[in-house]
Amino acid sequence: MSTFSAKPAEVQHEWFVIDATDKVLGRVASEVALRLRGKHKAIYTPHVDTGDFIVIINASKLKVTGTKNLDKVYYRHSGFPGGITATNFRDMQAKFPGRALEKAVKGMLPKGPLGYAMIKKLKVYGGAEHPHTAQQPKALEI
């Protein structure tokens, strides 16, 4: 018997919804990254996208432990000299709810074409509403 290798056409992608209210950022991000890669499935194959679609609601209510609310800093650069800007977690959540979670998950996924395809299956919304009810996502508790 040879090792099973999944083909892209035979992979079934399911939809899950996660309520991030009062959940810790890193714990949610690590579970989401695992499910986006498909490592929770028996048919996991490293070179095939076997992961599921994840919808996260209430991302604006995510928490971080300790003093990371002010200490965790996100950097970005405009490309111009002296164009680096820093934003802490509290300000990032206030201005762009969910972007901190997207950055955390993206850092946990592989870099390259397969990782870029995986991050596209993550849908993050700051509020309780999402436009993916037609896909009938199952509730996932973390």
Curated annotation (Swiss-Prot):
What cellular-component terms does GO give this entry? cytosolic large ribosomal subunit
Q: Which family does it belong to?
A: Belongs to the universal ribosomal protein uL13 family.
Q: Which domain of life is it from?
A: Bacteria
Give the GO biological process terms.
Answer: negative regulation of translation; translation
**Its biological function?**
This protein is one of the early assembly proteins of the 50S ribosomal subunit, although it is not seen to bind rRNA by itself. It is important during the early stages of 50S assembly.
Q: Which NCBIfam families match?
A: rplM_bact (TIGR01066)
**Complex and partners:** Part of the 50S ribosomal subunit.
Q: Which UniProt keywords apply?
A: Ribonucleoprotein, Ribosomal protein
Entry protein name? Large ribosomal subunit protein uL13
In alphabetical order, the GO MF annotations are: mRNA binding; structural constituent of ribosome
- Do you know which InterPro entries this protein is assigned to? Ribosomal_uL13, Ribosomal_uL13_bac-type, Ribosomal_uL13_sf
* CDD domains associated with the record: Ribosomal_L13 (cd00392)
